[in-house]
Regions:
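Transmembrane alpha-helices and adjacent helix-loop boundaries
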Residues: 2-378
Length: 378
């Protein structure tokens, strides 16, 4: 009796941007990256009519986008690379912001009045330590149980910050937080990081985004990144193969927390004032939605997701509904409906593009394998 096996044909796929990109010479790829970076730095000085609407401060919006991208990159390390569902990421954002506020503001109960730059390093260390403290007893949990614990962490931070008798001063908040690098002056002797021009803050945020991208990309290619992938795909199998899963999950939590703390420090130094209303749970959900929408586990996807969740609501500002709509629907600012419209966009993306707008190659393969399992099960 003879048996024959037939190798199944590889699945067909449409156009993939990765193929021409990976086959291009290295110098050409670096040239494209440098060109994109140059355009990004020039964006505040560009008047692009289709990108802005009436009432939108373009440089301020760009700075907001840079903060959201930083947060998306940090959460992508936890959710996308290591596969740990974190619903309380805004807690680390708050720890970083309040660390800077307490150490630098003259209105702080500490009264230290440190320089902003010095306080940033302390804020990063503080958030990294808070990530380790949270992760050490909880990272043995998985899935929904871990998500509930992280959600509780964010609520604890919010409740503490809402107490008017605490050092965080509740809704009164902490004011007079110094701006970054007050020693830098322009030709007229005015501080570069002032209150009227948001461009320097955007350039600072963009520089931090580039630094974090380079750092996370190197981590993804290292032994740590390979361990994260193994944990995300099958933690039990990874542990059976000798991967110290708990240690690498703790690394992911600490690194993600540090990036969140850096984002909070940048936010506090730019706003000059923070209170408990700045760190609601909805913020965590938005960042998580951006990571999933852009493409979990992929740096370009996380960047795109961060851009979209910051840009889409602001793009609606100043656009009004037609007057002929019935009832109170006519002549309404679409900005008031931003969460409804943004939710509809997310639903459509998850229906037609469940792997995200720019999925990682690994994520695409995982979804294909799951589709095959569903077909076989049927």
């Amino acid at each position: 009796v003879t048996t024959s096996t037939q190798t199944p044909a590889p699945p067909k796929s449409g156009f993939n941007l990765r193929t021409p990109w990976n086959s291009a010479p290295r110098a050409a790829r670096w040239g494209v990256v440098a060109l994109c970076a140059a355009v990004a730095y020039l964006l505040p000085n560009m008047n692009v009519p289709l990108l802005t609407t009436q009432g939108t401060d373009w440089p301020t919006l760009l700075f907001t986008i840079s903060v959201y991208v930083l947060l998306a990159l940090g959460l992508n390390v936890v959710v996308g690379f290591a596969g740990l569902l974190d619903l309380g990421y805004v807690g680390f954002f708050a720890v970083g912001a309040y660390s800077v506020a307490l150490l630098t503001s003259p209105n702080s109960d500490f009264g230290l009045e440190w320089p902003w730059l010095t306080a940033v390093f302390v804020a990063i260390v503080a958030t990294m330590i808070s990530g380790v403290i949270l992760g050490w007893p909880t990272l043995r949990l998985r899935g929904d149980y871990l998500a509930i614990v992280t959600l509780g962490f964010a609520e604890i931070i919010r409740v503490l910050a809402s107490d008017p008798e605490s050092i965080f001063k509740g809704d009164r908040g902490i004011s007079e937080i110094p701006h970054p690098a007050p020693f830098l002056k322009d030709s007229d002797g005015n501080p570069i990081f002032g209150v009227t021009d948001a461009r320097p803050y955007y350039w600072l945020g963009l520089t931090l985004v580039i630094i974090i991208i380079l750092g996370v990309k190197n981590l993804d290619r290292s032994r740590v990144g390979r361990a994260w992938v193994a944990i995300r795909e099958d933690e039990d199998a990874a542990e059976a193969m000798g991967v110290p899963t708990f240690r690498f999950k703790l690394w992911a939590f600490a690194i993600g927390a540090a990036v969140g703390g850096l984002s909070g420090a940048l936010f506090a130094g730019t706003q000059g004032f923070i209170n408990s209303a700045s760190f609601e749970l909805l913020f965590s959900i938005l960042i998580l939605a951006g990571v999933v929408m852009g493409g979990s586990g992929n740096l370009p996807g996380a960047i795109l997701g961060g851009v979209l969740i910051a840009y889409i609501p602001e793009r609606l500002r100043g656009i009004r509904t037609p007057e002929w709509l019935p009832g109170n629907l006519g002549n309404q600012d679409l900005f008031e409906w931003r969460y409804l419209l943004f939710g509809m966009v997310i639903i459509l993306i998850m229906i037609f593009r469940p792997q995200g707008l720019i999925p990682s190659r690994r994520r695409s393969l995982e979804l294909k394998e799951r589709e095959k399992e569903v077909i076989v099960g049927e």
